A protein has these predicted regions:
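Aromatic-lined, polymer-binding surfaces characteristic
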Residues: 34-56, 62-210
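Low-complexity, Ser/Thr/Pro/Gly-enriched N-terminal "stalk/linker" regions
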Residues: 1-51, 63-65
Length: 210
C-alpha cells in the first residue's frame, strides 16, 4: 500500500491527466458542458501544471508536454483583454514553479517577447485591497522580483500591509474578508486560502531566506 504522500501524488496526476485535454493549444480552457469559462482559468491551469512539475520533476502527463501547455496558458492569461488579478497571480506562481529566475526557467524560454513585456506591465499593476485580493499583489511582487523584472522587492512590505489589515479589522487576529461591511465580518475559507497562497509565494521566491 502506498503511503499518504504517494497516494496524493497519484491522485493529482490522475486528476490532471483527466482534465489536461481541456487545455487548448492557445492556452484557453474548454468549459464543462453547459457551463461558461472564467477569465482566470488559464492562470489556474498554469499553476496546477507548475506545481505538478515542481513536485515530480516531470515535463509530461499522458504524452502532453507540461512546459508547452503552461507557456500557452500564461500567454493566454497575460495577453487577455480582460485583466484578472487572480488569473495573473496564479499564472505567476505557475511560471516560478519551473525555475526561480528567467535564466533557469523552462517556461520563460517559451514566452514571446510581446508576452514577456505584457507580463512585466501587468505584474507592476497594483490596487490596494482590503480583503483577500491583497494576496495576489504579493504573488505578483514575488514573480516580478524573482524573474528579474524589478530590482526592488516589495514582497515584505505587501505582507506587512496584509497583516496590518488583520490587526485593524479583528481584535482576535482573525482574517476578516469583508472589513468595510460594519460589524458583520466574514471569517470563511478565504482566510485559510490567503495564508496558504502567501506560503506558496514565499516558497517560490528567489530569496529563500525571506
Amino acid at each position: 500500500m502506498l503511503n499518504f504522500s504517494a497516494q496524493c501524488m497519484d491522485m493529482a496526476q490522475s486528476i490532471l491527466g483527466g482534465n489536461i485535454g481541456a487545455i487548448n493549444q492557445d492556452g484557453s480552457i474548454v468549459p464543462v458542458e453547459n457551463e461558461s469559462s472564467f477569465d482566470c482559468e488559464p492562470g489556474h491551469a498554469a499553476m496546477a501544471l507548475g506545481e505538478f512539475h515542481r513536485a515530480t520533476g516531470l515535463t509530461e502527463i499522458d504524452g502532453k508536454n507540461i512546459v508547452d501547455l503552461t507557456a500557452a496558458c500564461i500567454t493566454a492569461q497575460t495577453n487577455d483583454k480582460e485583466y484578472t488579478e487572480d488569473g495573473l497571480a496564479y499564472s505567476s506562481l505557475g511560471l516560478l514553479a519551473f525555475g526561480p529566475s528567467k535564466e533557469r526557467n523552462l517556461v520563460w524560454e517559451k514566452l514571446s517577447e510581446e508576452t514577456r513585456k505584457n507580463l512585466d506591465k501587468r505584474l507592476l499593476s497594483r490596487s490596494d485591497y482590503e480583503d483577500h485580493l491583497q494576496i495576489f499583489n504579493i504573488a505578483k511582487a514575488v514573480a516580478r522580483f524573482s524573474m528579474g523584472l524589478s530590482k526592488k522587492d516589495e514582497t515584505g512590505k505587501l505582507i506587512d500591509k496584509f497583516l496590518e489589515r488583520i490587526d485593524q479589522t479583528s481584535r482576535g487576529k482573525y482574517f476578516d474578508d469583508k472589513p468595510a461591511s460594519g460589524i458583520d465580518g466574514v471569517f470563511d475559507i478565504y482566510g485559510i486560502v490567503s495564508f496558504v497562497f502567501i506560503r506558496q509565494s514565499l516558497q517560490l521566491h528567489a530569496n529563500m531566506h525571506l
